[in-house]
C-alpha cells in the first residue's frame, strides 16, 4: 500500500515525535512530609538522598538533610516552617549546599546562603563554592611566617598574629571582643594601600552569628565610613534568623574566604561568635533527637568547630602561597574559660587573646590579660624590629604584676622594686588605645621603643598619650619605614630615634 506524499510526511513526523517523546522528561526523586514542627521536617521516600544535600519544599522553602534514618529523613528548614504541611511534596535538588564566592562579593552584605540582603541588587560575576570542604593537607601547607597586623599595640607586640594562623578572642560580654576584630579590619586599609601587588592585599570576611540586626547595621556604617567595605564581605545570620542559618553562616563565610586563599591571595575571616553557633547546633541536634552530652551539646560539637577552623591555612609556594587567617570569638560566662565550648576552641586554635572585665573597668582598653594571652606561632611572623623592641616587655610586665601584688601590703620596697613598679606602670599605660584608631606598625615600634628604653620613666602617667602623639611627629618618616625592613633595628638606626626621643621627652616631665 502506497501513501500519498502528504501522508508519508505525516508518518515521518509522527515517528520522529514518538522517538523523541521521553527525551524532554526530567525525573526527580520526591518524598512526602510525614511531620513538621520547630524547624524540623520528617520526610518519607527520599531513599537516595545524600547527607548535607539541599531539598526544596512545595512552598519554595529550602532545607538541608542532616539525619538519614531507616524510615525517614530528618530535614532542617532554612526559614519558616509555617508554609509546610503534612503530606507536602519534597524534591531533591541533587546539590550539596554551596554559596557564591569571588571579588563580586566585596562590599556586600549577604545571608548564610549568600543571598544579598543589603538592597544593592543581585551579585555580578561570581563562582559558586561548596560550603563544606576538606581542609588543606599537610603537604599543601607552609608554616606561618608573614605578619597579620591588627593595628593594636597590645596585640602586635605581645600576642602577634601571622597570616594563616587561628587566634581566638575570648572574654565576657562587653569586654571589647568585636572591637578588636573591627580594628583589625580597619587597619588593613592602610596596609592594603601600601601593598604593591595583589598578593599582599588582605581581604576580610566578617561573619555575624546570632547578633542583633541593629548591631550589624552599625558595623556596616562604621566600615563604609572608613572605606573599609571595599575589601570586606559581611555574612549575617542574625538573632532573628532560624538556627540552621546560624549554624551554616561560619562555613559560608569560610568558603568565601577560601576563594582568596586558593587563588594566591590572603583572607582574614572573623567568626563573631562561635558560642552562638554551638547553641544553634545544639538546638538543631536536640530537635533531631540526637543524644545529648556534656552541657546538652551533641557529641560532635568539637568536630563542628575543628573542621571549620582547620580550613585556616598558609598555603605552600607550589599551591599559590595564599592564606586564610581565622579570628574566632568566644563569649564566656563570668570569666569561666574552662567551660565546654571555650576549652574546645582553645585546644583547636594557635593561641588566644583573653579579655577580662576587671581589666576593662580599670580603663585598660583593649582589656587584654597579658598573662593568659598567648600566640603559639605568631612570633615566627613578627617583624624583626618589633621583636627586638618588645622582647623583654612581656617578662617585665609579669614581674610588675608580681611585685604590684606584693606592694599592696604597704611594706617598704627597695629601689629596684620601685623602679620595676614604675616601669611596669608605664608599660601598662602605653598599650592603651582608643577604639577604631589602629596604629601603623612602624609607629607602634617607635612608641614601644620609647617605653621599653626608659624614656617615659619620669613622666606622669596621664601625659603619656600626649607624649605618644608628639614623638610620632618628631621621628623622621623615612626612618620609621626603615623599621619594616628585614634588618630590624641596627645600632646605627637606634642612634637617630634616641636623640629625637630625649629631646621630645623634656616638655612632658
Swiss-Prot record:
Determine if Transport is one of this entry's keywords. yes
Pfam families, A to Z: ATP-synt_ab, ATP-synt_ab_C, ATP-synt_ab_N
- GO MF entry, a single one: proton-transporting ATP synthase activity, rotational mechanism
Q: Which domain of life is it from?
A: Eukaryota
The UniProt keyword set, sorted, is: ATP synthesis, ATP-binding, CF(1), Hydrogen ion transport, Ion transport, Membrane, Mitochondrion, Mitochondrion inner membrane, Nucleotide-binding, Transport
Q: Which GO terms describe its cellular component?
A: mitochondrial inner membrane; proton-transporting ATP synthase complex
Q: How does it assemble?
A: F-type ATPases have 2 components, CF(1) - the catalytic core - and CF(0) - the membrane proton channel. CF(1) has five subunits: alpha(3), beta(3), gamma(1), delta(1), epsilon(1). CF(0) has three main subunits: a, b and c.
Q: What does this protein do?
A: Mitochondrial membrane ATP synthase (F(1)F(0) ATP synthase or Complex V) produces ATP from ADP in the presence of a proton gradient across the membrane which is generated by electron transport complexes of the respiratory chain. F-type ATPases consist of two structural domains, F(1) - containing the extramembraneous catalytic core, and F(0) - containing the membrane proton channel, linked together by a central stalk and a peripheral stalk. During catalysis, ATP synthesis in the catalytic domain of F(1) is coupled via a rotary mechanism of the central stalk subunits to proton translocation.
Spell out the protein name for this chain: ATP synthase subunit alpha, mitochondrial
Q: Tell me which species this is from.
A: Triticum aestivum
From the broadest rank down, the organism's phylogenetic lineage runs: Eukaryota, Viridiplantae, Streptophyta, Embryophyta, Tracheophyta
